[in-house]
Design a protein with these regions (language model features):
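Short, Lys/Arg-rich flexible segments
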Residues: 1-141
Length: 141
């Protein structure tokens, strides 16, 4: 037979479980966001370039259309970061570029009328799906 508890005990237990759930959520969001950031930087470094096309004095070879952008000066690569904040009972993760010219990362991700997309953020999220699924199972069972 189940042990009877008082309303006060029940509320304390509920509060404890609520705090643990929020801590677990924050851990999941923090680790997932960091992995997406790491993956975005890795896929840019490892992207396939087009040797038949060259731009600029240095002879920068852009990535093949549809692949993440190739690193040229490293501006985008160095600007990618993540942050996690807690608002009420939610842990919110953000991954993106803190570059001052906000059009640059967006133009690479989605393309322009003259340039095909070089997705870096969405490609990172796709690559991290299994990592996040396994992490979810590890944290939440």
């Amino acid at each position: 037979m189940a042990k009877a508890i008082s309303i006060d005990e029940f509320q304390r237990e509920l509060e404890r479980y609520s705090k643990q759930a929020l801590a677990d959520s924050k851990r999941f969001v923090t680790l997932s966001s960091a992995e997406v950031e790491r993956t975005a930087k890795t896929i840019m470094r490892d992207t396939i370039t087009n040797p038949d096309v060259s731009y600029g004095r240095k002879g920068h070879h852009p990535s093949v259309e549809g692949n993440p952008p190739a690193v040229d000066k490293g501006t985008l690569l160095q600007s990618i970061t993540h942050s996690v904040k807690v608002e009420g009972n939610e842990a919110i993760g953000e991954v993106g570029s803190i570059i001052s010219n906000s059009d640059y990362p967006r133009f690479l991700e989605y393309g322009t009328s003259k340039m095909k997309p070089r997705p870096w953020l969405s490609a990172s999220l796709i690559k991290c799906q299994s990592f996040m699924a396994n992490l979810w199972k590890e944290i939440f069972g």
